[in-house]
Amino acid sequence: MKKKMRLKVLLASTATALLLLSGCQSNQTDQTVATYSGGKVTESSLYKELKQSPTTKTMLANMLIYRALNHAYGKSVSTKTVNDAYDSYKQQYGENFDAFLSQNGFSRSSFKESLRTNFLSEVALKKLKKVSESQLKAAWKTYQPKVTVQHILTSDEDTAKQVISDLAAGKDFAMLAKTDSIDTATKDNGGKISFELNNKTLDATFKDAAYKLKNGDYTQTPVKVTDGYEVIKMINHPAKGTFTSSKKALTASVYAKWSRDSSIMQRVISQVLKNQHVTIKDKDLADALDSYKKLATTN
C-alpha cells in the first residue's frame, strides 16, 4: 500500500547558495552573477536579496539542523539504510516516482537527504530521550503484536466488492491480488505485508480493520483508505504475550509515537543544536533558530 508522505522538505540548495555567497563576501570578492543592458548582478547584491526572502531563514534552519544531526549521529545511519528506503519508495511509485517527487517539492538528491534527516532524527530521539518503566506499562495497555496480512488495494469500491464476492466464491486471495490489486509493491507476492500497530506508513483505518480479524478471516466490506479501497485477510495474528517478553517491541512503539509528536521532536532537535554549538553569524539571519533556542532553555 502507498506510504504516506511525512518528510520535511529540505530546501538546501538555496541555503547552500546563500552560505556560499556569504563565504565569497568574507573573502572580499564580488563576482558577477549576471549582466543586463546597463548593469549587472553581483554576488553581494544577490546575497542581500536572498536574505530578504521570507523563506530564507527557514531554509537556513533546515540546513543547519541537517548538518548538526549528521555531525552528531551520521555514523549511525548508513548509506545503505537511506538507499534501501529510497528504493522502496521508487519501487512503490514505479513510473510515477518522478511525479511523486515533484508533487512533494523534492529532487532525487534532496529526497534522499530528507530520508536521511528522518533517520538521523530518530537516532537523536533515542539517544536523548529514554523510555521509562512507567511509560512502557502505559504502552502495554494498548499494545498489539506484529501481524501478517494479505491485502488487495483497488481504486474504486465496486472492484473491492467484486474481490470480496470472488473470495466468497472460493477464489484464491493471492491470485486476486495479482490481477486486481493496484499496489505494485505487493501484488506479485500475494499482497502480503507485516506490520505493527505503531506503523507510520499505513492508514489508521487499514490497521484498525486488520487487527479486528482472526487468522484466516478477511474483511467483509471494503475498507476506505487514502489511496482507494482495501480488502484485507489475516494470515498471522499472534497472541499478545507477556509484558516482559514484549519490552523491546513496547520501547519501539513508544519511540514511534514520540517521533510523530512535533513538540517532542522539536525539543530533541533543539538539544542537538545546543550540543553542536550551532551559531548564526549573520545578524540579519540570527533569529532563524529562535524557536528551537527557546525550547532548549526549557528542556
Curated annotation (Swiss-Prot):
InterPro entries: Foldase_PrsA (IPR023059), PPIase_dom_sf (IPR046357), PPIase_PpiC (IPR000297), PPIase_PpiC_CS (IPR023058), PrsA_foldase (IPR050245), Trigger_fact/SurA_dom_sf (IPR027304). It comes from the Bacteria. It is an enzyme of class 5 (isomerase). Residues 144-236 form the PpiC domain. It catalyses: [protein]-peptidylproline (omega=180) = [protein]-peptidylproline (omega=0). It is found in: Cell membrane. GO terms for biological process: protein folding. GO terms for molecular function: peptidyl-prolyl cis-trans isomerase activity. It is a lipid-anchor. This is Foldase protein PrsA. It comes from Lactococcus lactis subsp. cremoris.
